[in-house]
Amino acid sequence: ETNYKNQPYFVIETTIPEVSKLILRTQEDTLQQVDDLYTHLEEITRQTLERDKMLAIIYYPGPDKYNTTGTATLFSRKLWYKEMERKLNRIADINTVYIYKNDEGLKKWRKANWTEDKNQIIERLFFKYHYPCGSFTVVHPSGHYKSGLGEYSKSWVWKLTEDLVQAH
């Protein structure tokens, strides 16, 4: 069993026997249609997102052996999200949205207002594989984004957000 938390990459199995792919855990690129992303998220979350603010997308892919175990309580998860959002808002003007592919097992994560990834738009844009635990993406209004794939800490979310702020 592999612990991915401190590794810079994942090993992803392919459909070809004995052939795997290495995927970097931090991804960076630029969306050409960033306005379409904001529009889609507004439609599915029923929130108004300020287009001049950055966007943090917290993503839950569904249950796996990493996010269905552990000792976190509902209270500790609430505190975790609250602290993450509080510092994100100090780092940048930012909209934070919580998106899921499969809500099975999500009850223990209920602090946040989770929204289904209808038509798998977010998954196709940022999370092409099921990365263990969950993932996140931070998007600058210019379309420049950074994603953290798989189990993540608040400090990693903050770091990639700070990187984008400094780059712009």
Residue ranges and their predicted role:
Residues 81, 85, 123, 154, ...:
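Extracytoplasmic/secreted envelope proteins and their assembly/folding machinery
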Residues 145-166:
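Non-catalytic, surface beta->alpha helical segment in thiol-disulfide oxidoreductase systems
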Residues 1-88, 92-100, 167:
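Non-globular targeting/processing and membrane-anchoring segments
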Residues 87-91, 128-129, 160-163:
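Structured segments of extracytoplasmic/periplasmic soluble domains
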Residues 103-132:
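Thioredoxin-like thiol-disulfide oxidoreductase module
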